[in-house]
Amino acid sequence: MAALLVIFLGAACLLAARSPAAEIDLATLSCDKYENEIVGSPDGGQTSSDPVPKGPVAAPAAPPRPDAINTVMWLFGFSVAKAGEHVMYGEALASFGFALDAECRNEPGATLLHAVTSVRPNRDKPMDLSALNCGTFESRHADSVRTDPDSARTIMMWLFGYAVGLSGSHVFDPDGVERFAAGLKAECASNPNDSLFDVLSALSRPGKR
């Protein structure tokens, strides 16, 4: 879908003021709805610059969509966890997005969970999470938050998706990333010499550390 290419190339332009977004259950959301309602273009509804309509008052607006690029990043992290891997592929986001798009086009009625766990994107430039010191990661991430907050957030969304994939859940809560980031920061502060993979595993299974 051409819209995905625009999303990947213009990610910074897509980050807007955030409002509470609805949770997404990958086991019940169809590929078709994902393509059209989550990452697809808006359906041409009225904008703030349009004249105020006359007639009956419109129904309350639906919950806003989660940010598209961050959604794809979350799904990418989730899929890597589900595949049993512990690496982050630094240049494979576009490959994952296009592979997911193709899978959903081929099986529009399939669940998003099925599609996400079926795609096999390129495995370019892997970074082993089990070899990355958690304290080192948190220090780098803090620098990134100061210098490039949008990129820092997308990386955190990948890690959030990865942790949810490890936990066995299949629900994406777009507004849960801040809580997750705070928990990760606290764990890294308490266990700076542990690997990022070990800390993510602990976060995904509270009480099992």
Feature names for model-found ranges:
Residues 22-194, 198:
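Short N-proximal segments of mature Sec-exported proteins
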Residues 208-209:
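Short, solvent-exposed mixed-charge patches
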Residues 15-21:
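Sec/Tat signal peptide C-region and signal peptidase I cleavage site
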Residues 3-14:
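Bacterial N-terminal signal peptides
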